[in-house]
Amino acid sequence: MPRQFDLEHTRNIGIMAHIDAGKTTTTERILFYTGRVHKIGETHEGSATMDWMEQEQERGITITSAATTAQWKGNRINIIDTPGHVDFTVEVERSLRVLDGSVTVFCAKGGVEPQSETVWRQADKYGVPRMAYVNKMDIMGADFYNVIAMMKDRLQCNAVPIQLPIGSEDCFVGMVDLVTMTSHIFKDDLGQVIEDQPIPDDMIEISNKYREQLLEAVAEQDEELMMKYLEGEEFTLEEIKAGIRKATIAVKMIPVTCGSSYKNKGVQQMLDAVIDFMPSPTDIPAIKGISVDGDTEIERPADDNGPFAALAFKIMTDPYVGKLCFFRVYSGTLNSGSYVLNSTKNKRERIGRILQMHANHREEIQVVHSGDIAAAVGLKDTTTGDTLCEENNPVILESMEFPEPVIEVAIEPKTKAGQEKMGVALQKLAEEDPTFRVHTDAETGQTIIGGMGELHLDIIVDRMLREFKVEANVGNPQVSYKETIRKAVKSEMKYARQSGGKGQYGHCVIELEPREPGAGYEFVNKITGGAIPKEYIAPIDAGIQEAMNTGVLAGYNVVDIKVTLIDGSYHEVDSSEMAFKIAGSMAFKDGCRKANPVLLEPIMKVDVSVPEEYMGDVMGGLNARRGRIEGMEARGGAQNIRAVVPLSEMFGYATALRSSTQGRGTFSMQTSHFEEVPKSIQEKVISSRTTGV
């Protein structure tokens, strides 16, 4: 089947912003104007097409990235609407990885808000070309020029307006187009009747000033245009458009448009700018990958005739078709029913059906081409970040890295019958979301779930109830401590039982000594002359390892110990494997008590990014949490602080950081190593563990 839109007329864009800047409302208007929806949905009414999960409609926020496709003036635009809440940054991260460009929505009143900075840094990481749309020009306190200043200051970017608003708040009636130097005035509520007029007299001076800035920004990217500019020659309309496009794709300039999505003003002009200035799949560099053996770098340019290569960027469980895998095609074509290679896992997969997604509606298609974003049904082993490619031309595309969970809680089903259902539900949810982890605590036997924040885990528990009908109790966050010893000791233990008939007899002498942190457990057998028969050596080792699961201080796992078996004795009749296993366990416990046992706690590597004015408060806060500052650096208009802090002190840090930086600070953390717990805190941990208080 021939492609409907060639690559030059295809755009893959994301819509990103701070929570409540109006992303989803903007996407709804795009769908309305491009003819995908015949009635506009509103987020505050819970009827937005893109917010299709029940929790999204209730909370009025976007949680998952909904993908949809639209058509505008003979072009196809694939749009991904991403969440603005910090707990769901993984959705933004994986969307950016497969997009060619993005529209960042700013609130005309709030300007550059904290999540805007986070999202901007993520887009910088992937080198994504961007344009900005200043939304909510109709609300009280709207200030377009302040937003431009904040973008330059906080995001360190070259923000260049290509439109200026005519009026603001209640008087926002249209905009000046700085490319054509005309004005667009909106004459109806739906924003479909637009009159082109000369620039109003009171705006001629400011329009000329910003037009000059635009021409200068365009000239800087092109030597020929710079010569023309310096000689005072006029640019043609085509030269200006080509110059803006070139600078935008090179991420040297951020074109800025304005409007009010809720009042239906400015969205069509923003769509025109997407077509004019955002890259097509052929404008971006060829995607790089490596050969399966990892030796050779391979490039895959956007070309329908090239070998098929795609990246799976999202897994979703759909109530009707089961597991859906969203993927972006970088080169080649793919037919439904065909086989592909998952080169990341070296598994052959069959593409059952291919679906073009429109928020939560779907349309079955037979073939996808390079540059397309679609969803496949029938992939069994594919997860987020996997490469799908032609079996004869394998390639592994650069995958995505996801942050480690920063919060963990214990969870249990409310009923015994829910145990199995909960296991299935958690497995499916973990497949969908790479930042959500599940494991069983060996000490307590509890199921522990980890995620990016409390809202993240709230939504997971909520989805378990709605989608899988599992009710669960959720505990408070816990730290998993470890135990070890600080000095070498010798321990001897004899286990003897006589109760008529065959008795039990096991006797061993062991030496315990501490090992380097992270070195683990080592068992050495130094028995000579048959003091203990060979068949009883392994049971002694097994008994010791079993005893290591519950330490002598507070019942935590024991780590980093070397045990040497040096002597012992046995009884011809009464000795057994069980007797020696018990003797080994008892000797180990006895030795630990004498070997100066200590508690170890997990230490986290913490990265905090804050505006400079909050540095003192934040560093003081980290010190108060027993943190050690390891370094600082300026990064993208913010200060980045690196520290190591005990995990037990990090609970509640997200809230503390938010309040001490007015919501502008962000942090991430991952486990670094284990360290000895200070004596005063060790006593508290032991008493709370033994008394349960």
Curated annotation (Swiss-Prot):
Annotated localization: Cytoplasm
Any coiled-coil regions, as ranges: none
A biological process term (GO) from this entry: ribosome disassembly
Annotated GTP binding sites: 17-24, 81-85, 135-138
Family matches, as Pfam families: EFG_C, EFG_III, EFG_IV, GTP_EFTU, GTP_EFTU_D2
Chief location bin: cytoplasm
SMART domains: EFG_C, EFG_IV
Keyword annotations of the record: Cytoplasm, Elongation factor, GTP-binding, Nucleotide-binding, Protein biosynthesis
Residues covered by the tr-type G domain: 8-282
GO CC entries: cytoplasm
GO molecular-function terms, A-Z: GTP binding; GTPase activity; translation elongation factor activity
Record-stated family: Belongs to the TRAFAC class translation factor GTPase superfamily. Classic translation factor GTPase family. EF-G/EF-2 subfamily.
Biological role: Catalyzes the GTP-dependent ribosomal translocation step during translation elongation. During this step, the ribosome changes from the pre-translocational (PRE) to the post-translocational (POST) state as the newly formed A-site-bound peptidyl-tRNA and P-site-bound deacylated tRNA move to the P and E sites, respectively. Catalyzes the coordinated movement of the two tRNA molecules, the mRNA and conformational changes in the ribosome.
The protein's name: Elongation factor G
Organism of this sequence: Ruminiclostridium cellulolyticum (strain ATCC 35319 / DSM 5812 / JCM 6584 / H10) (Clostridium cellulolyticum)
Record gene name: fusA
